[in-house]
């Protein structure tokens, strides 16, 4: 048998996999020399949760060919690396992450998180999917094909669109999901099913679309990720599990976690509640953590630069009382098993990608080196590899399609003739009540006015897909600027990602939205009639193709300008809603459960944009 060169091994392809593994067999037997012998002081076998002393890992191409006691390998190698003082653990994985929330493109995301041990990510891709659904898979695989060592396993978004009352950018059903799963083995399944009321209501206009995507995923035995926010009663938890929705990352209490765990859900713990959850579960006597993973979900590059990536989540779990070994299992073998990716990632074992994290201290998860694809890619927190140069095409960079200048009149809310006041429907950020708030607001010059004395300002959604700039506007309570002629606008508005704006004057709102149109997305801040800060997200209106430090500098400048503004604030049910610069308004535009009344861009089913997504009922914003 002649020795044939292995395939490039960037993406998982069945035919290539056979050739790769045929070669790995020969390397493991010593018939063909390995590329590198990496000898370490200790190695964590995550299958048994046992430490093995003085081990060698034989690397061949991008994979592991052999693991065993030092000196046991029967063949030769081209290179020798000996790290007797370091401990080897598998590359860390993200079971559920929106890379878009880092706001850097995948090639820069790799440079950002690989020094923190994050070698693979299951990308919950409904953000970019909602901007450009047809190019979704191409977008997520481009960086890997260009040479990035990070593995991205996309899960096409079920929330495309998030509800039947939103449109533009992408529309996924059975045909699209079947196509993605047939196109690439990198596709791990179906991204979080968020509109769960539609799953068990045949009258909901999203019912057939969602079940079509579920069917297509079952056909390929893919994983169907869940999003069970607001589900706490036993009947609904059972219905959620019965639908085949396999996981949840939205639990807020220990009791809720246990109720969902006992119905078979895979539980994904997020950092903001992780410590409390781990402590509560330990107090409850939980011993088997095999049905748990740690997940980031959303984290900006600014926060990653400050606190870390997956390694930060592991440290939180350890500080809450978990052993380091269990915490590491929760970012390696556990998520790999759940996502059915164990032949490729999740452990230091033959056939897997040669993704290895070398620690010099276990309790603090101090990372000395990170190996990926069989090469050293990061050391002492520094990324060592060149960044692939990707010239993102127009389908990725020309996505804020507003083909005219927005005017103050676009944000006006007219009053009925002869009225001094109008009844107005209001929302707060993260308003999950069954009904909206009602107030009487003053009328001036034929338009309904804000009332800053009562913490009332104006909020708007601008369609960025049709080119027409169709706008819906209403009054919101407890957010936005009190400073005159001031507005904030952003093109990341989960999950449809139309442009949103909040402002103390219609003219300032128009100025901020026009600035976003000019830079093709990001943030724009107008203070007292002047544009004072912008942050550019030119890729999808969600990300930038620039170094994370450069983006962070722009964000810090935005925050600094934001500190000069008097921001309204009232608490809501969300524990993650804080006073000051209202960055989390980007999440306050969500339309999935437990939201009821929401504001969306004008659509056929919601012509004025104000709709109850649970019932389909619409209502005027003033009357």
Curated annotation (Swiss-Prot):
Enzyme Commission code(s) on record: 3.5.4.2
UniProt superkingdom: Bacteria
GO term, biological process aspect, one: adenine catabolic process
Similarity comment: Belongs to the metallo-dependent hydrolases superfamily. Adenine deaminase family.
Keyword presence, Hydrolase: yes
Pfam families: Adenine_deam_C, Amidohydro_1
Protein name: Adenine deaminase 2
Designated gene of the protein: ade2
Coiled-coil regions, chain positions: none
Molecular function in Gene Ontology: adenine deaminase activity
Cofactor(s) the protein needs: Mn(2+)
Protein source organism: Jannaschia sp. (strain CCS1)
Keyword annotations from UniProtKB, A to Z: Hydrolase, Manganese
Enzyme class: hydrolase
Disulfide bond residue pairs: none
InterPro entries: Adenine_deam, Adenine_deam_C, Amidohydro-rel, Metal-dep_hydrolase_composite, Metal_Hydrolase
Catalytic activity: adenine + H2O + H(+) = hypoxanthine + NH4(+)
Transmembrane segment boundaries: none
